[in-house]
């Protein structure tokens, strides 16, 4: 028998081998467990499926966009996206019918013959048309050529297609006979019947022209004015930019570049753009100047003197064209004066004013006061009780008669005022307990504040459109995770006709899943914040996912945007598809909540809602174990680009990767109206510092620890690229590694495929820890129009 010790000696090499093999197996197992994820071109292609140009066409009968017809019957047509194309439908509320607006097949056939092209019933070459007065024919334009077809489709004939007033940069008079436009800094009028043109003003010169809105980031030759109802007068202004500082951009090309210069006042500038209000009488013509000092180039809404059209905001004519009401806004947006002018003499009467400690707003996108000379009243919107409420003033005395709306929640838009019935129709948010406070609802209330009625009952976000008479409205309602339903309602909210219900079958078949709404607590631990979460469609709760914040900090809007249904919200779902959790959170300092909520970071723009973003993301990680909070990223554009870089500098241990595009990184280099409203007037102290120093990202760049990609268009005339270059310079001086992409001759948006791909690559490489497919190529396609657009 072999001694035990010898047996052990002989077995030792085999034991060592077994240990080595076992150890190697364990190492291999550990390496497999920690192996970086693999991201392929197929993964990118799958993610691309969830970009808007792929998802939008998959939603059929998405919503109703009514084109109302003349008359009291409330008839309207809309265009609907259907299987394999689109069709036009005509709604008759009196008959309670919904039928084809014309014979699609026959119109397609006769038009094909007349135009020498090939069309079919669901692929007609137009998206808009007008009925003839008798309703027997339709007129439309195809590639600049006018056509008229009878609704039965028996004939189609080519017609002259006059250039649209908008294309000519004109504003047509209410009676449809005249069009006003700018020529060489003066206003001219054109007779639409005779084409005869004549000047209305002659003293306009460079930097002191009429009706122009070329101030700061706004550059347009569209005249800003308001015709009187009787088409005899025009309310406008002479804009004074003499001595105002300029902004400069240089294009990129072979040979000598072109220098682009325009007036662009900045915070703290002694001389900024002002306007001198005038009324132009077409008889003569003659110009009546209002007898007041020049007004600031300001309005009661975000950062311009006009809304989404060329109409001048904060100006209203009386129905008889004898009186002109307007609001003068101080440079710091803290003081508003309601005034009424005599357009014949230029005399101005100050009726009442309002002062606030931060900034005044009368709405989002459109001013929400109403001039009611027929009843000697003014409807005024104010946040004096911490919510956007309506108030009724006496037009003769300027005294407050009564508060119209009360309680929590905001009036966001006055959509109709019925002086005869003494009723106000308005869009409100946050007024229904237990519902998302961002959901819009339509309400009706009496001038005296009594009989408040909810007209859109569904627990959803309501996108409404009233008929010209106000007797009907189209109600499109949905939620981020619930498809759209469209109905026609009477003025009292009663349903008249069911119109459409969105069909998501194609979208769902493509793998789409809705975002997940959530709530978290704000920085104060008390206030509820609302957001959306996007997960990979192949989500596995046993895995750990990095989290990415898609941010827009406001202050004029938030990260989430619409609370209605959308097949795509930027590239949030597409990015999530690569192996991330993507979130959007509306933090404190964004609108549509209380005034206190909106004022949260007034005077401290560097805040950018970041304390709320960090707090919210941490809460989500505690709630959901599949979120890896140690791998947090952030991205955004414009204000979101500003916030992204700020996040990387102010929270360097939390945010590991950021992609910042087109950021206004130092608001001293962004237009005056924006910054002076949200940060306050620039105040320089005796020691050389100012109240704007801390908001400047370059002053915090030395704190960078993570991976940061900066991008900007070199011809960005909204946020000039020097904002990003200030940060670049600071990072270089601090010896920090970073990445930079400049887009030659590009403007502000940077929504092109190359930027999307670079953003995806950056997060995949630095946050996910994988190597992205090399130079993946997107294949965008034109977005098919949605129903009614």
Where are these regions (language model features)?
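Beta-propeller folds
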Residues: 10, 26-484, 488-489, 499-505, ...
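Bacterial N-terminal signal peptides that target proteins for export
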Residues: 2-15
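Small side chains
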Residues: 23-26, 235, 264, 531, ...
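Serine-hydrolase catalytic core recognition
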Residues: 246, 292, 312-313, 321, ...
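Bacterial N-terminal signal peptides
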Residues: 12-24
């Amino acid at each position: 028998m072999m001694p035990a010790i010898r047996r052990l000696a002989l077995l030792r090499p085999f034991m060592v081998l077994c240990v080595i093999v076992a150890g190697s197996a364990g190492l291999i197992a550990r390496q497999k467990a920690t192996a970086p994820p693999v991201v392929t071109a197929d993964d990118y292609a799958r993610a691309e499926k969830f970009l808007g140009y792929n998802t939008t066409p998959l939603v059929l009968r998405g919503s109703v966009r009514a084109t109302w017809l003349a008359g009291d019957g409330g008839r309207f047509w809309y265009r609907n996206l259907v299987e394999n194309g689109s069709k036009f439908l005509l709604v008759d509320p009196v008959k309670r019918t919904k039928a084809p607006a014309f014979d699609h097949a026959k119109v397609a056939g006769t038009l094909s013959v007349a135009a020498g092209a090939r069309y079919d019933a669901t692929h007609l070459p137009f998206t808009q048309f007008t009925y003839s007065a008798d309703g027997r024919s339709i007129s439309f334009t195809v590639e600049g050529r006018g056509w008229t077809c009878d609704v039965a489709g028996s004939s189609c004939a080519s017609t002259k297609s006059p250039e649209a007033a908008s294309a000519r940069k004109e504003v047509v008079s209410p009676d449809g006979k005249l069009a006003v436009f700018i020529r060489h800094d003066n206003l001219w009028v054109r007779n639409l019947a005779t084409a005869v043109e004549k000047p209305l003003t002659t003293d306009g010169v460079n930097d002191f022209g009429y009706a122009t809105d070329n101030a700061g980031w706004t550059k347009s030759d569209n005249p800003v004015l308001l015709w009187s109802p009787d088409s005899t007068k025009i309310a406008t202004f002479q804009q004074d930019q003499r001595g105002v500082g300029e902004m400069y951009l240089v294009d990129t090309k072979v040979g000598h570049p072109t220098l682009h210069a325009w007036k662009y006042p900045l915070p703290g500038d002694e001389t900024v753009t002002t306007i001198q209000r005038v009324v132009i009488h077409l008889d003569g013509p003659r110009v009546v100047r209002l007898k007041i000092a020049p007004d600031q180039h300001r309005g009661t809404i975000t950062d311009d003197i006009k809304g989404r059209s060329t109409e001048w905001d904060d100006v209203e004519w009386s129905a008889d064209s004898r009186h002109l009401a307007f609001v003068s806004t101080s440079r710091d947006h803290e003081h508003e004066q309601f005034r009424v002018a005599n357009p014949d003499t230029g005399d101005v009467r100050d009726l009442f004013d309002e002062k606030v400690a931060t900034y005044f707003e009368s709405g989002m996108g459109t001013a929400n006061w109403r001039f009611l000379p027929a009843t000697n009243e003014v409807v005024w919107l104010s946040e004096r009780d911490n919510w956007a409420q309506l108030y009724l003033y006496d037009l003769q005395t300027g005294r407050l008669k009564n508060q119209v709306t009360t309680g929590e929640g905001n009036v966001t838009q006055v959509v109709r005022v019925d002086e005869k019935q003494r009723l106000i129709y308005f869009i409100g948010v946050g007024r229904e307990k237990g519902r998302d406070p961002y959901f819009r609802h339509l309400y009706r209330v009496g001038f005296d504040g009594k009989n408040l009625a909810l007209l859109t009952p569904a627990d959803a976000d309501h996108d409404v459109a009233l008929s010209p008479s106000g007797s009907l409205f189209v109600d499109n309602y949905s939620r981020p995770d619930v498809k759209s339903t469209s109905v026609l309602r009477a003025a009292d909210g009663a349903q008249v006709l069911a119109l459409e219900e969105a069909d998501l079958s194609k979208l769902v078949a493509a793998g789409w899943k809705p975002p997940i709404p959530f709530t978290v607590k704000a920085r104060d631990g008390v206030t509820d914040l609302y957001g959306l979460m996007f997960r990979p469609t192949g989500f596995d709760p046993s895995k750990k996912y990095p989290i990415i914040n898609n941010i827009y900090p406001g202050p004029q809007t938030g990260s989430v945007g619409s609370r209605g249904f959308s097949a795509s919200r930027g590239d949030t779902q597409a990015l999530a598809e690569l192996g991330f959790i993507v979130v959007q959170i509306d933090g404190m300092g964004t609108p549509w909540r209380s005034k206190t909520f909106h004022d949260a970071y007034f005077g401290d723009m560097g805040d950018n809602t970041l304390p709320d973003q960090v707090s919210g993301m941490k809460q989500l990680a505690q709630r959901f174990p599949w979120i890896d909070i140690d791998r947090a990223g952030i991205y955004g554009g414009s204000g979101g680009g500003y916030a992204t870089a700020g996040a990387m500098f102010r929270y360097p241990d939390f945010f590991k990767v950021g992609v910042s595009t087109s950021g206004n990184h130092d608001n001293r280099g962004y237009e005056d109206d924006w910054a002076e409203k949200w940060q306050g007037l620039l105040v320089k102290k005796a020691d050389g510092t100012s109240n704007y120093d801390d908001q400047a990202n370059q002053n915090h760049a030395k704190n960078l620890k993570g991976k940061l990609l900066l991008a900007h268009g070199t011809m960005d005339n909204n946020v000039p690229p020097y904002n990003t270059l200030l940060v670049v310079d600071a990072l270089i001086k601090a010896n920090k590694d970073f990445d930079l992409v400049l887009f030659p001759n590009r403007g502000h948006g940077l929504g092109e495929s190359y930027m999307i791909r670079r953003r995806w690559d950056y997060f995949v490489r630095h946050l996910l820890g994988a190597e992205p497919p090399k130079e993946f190529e997107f294949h965008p396609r034109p977005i098919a129009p949605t129903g009614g657009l």
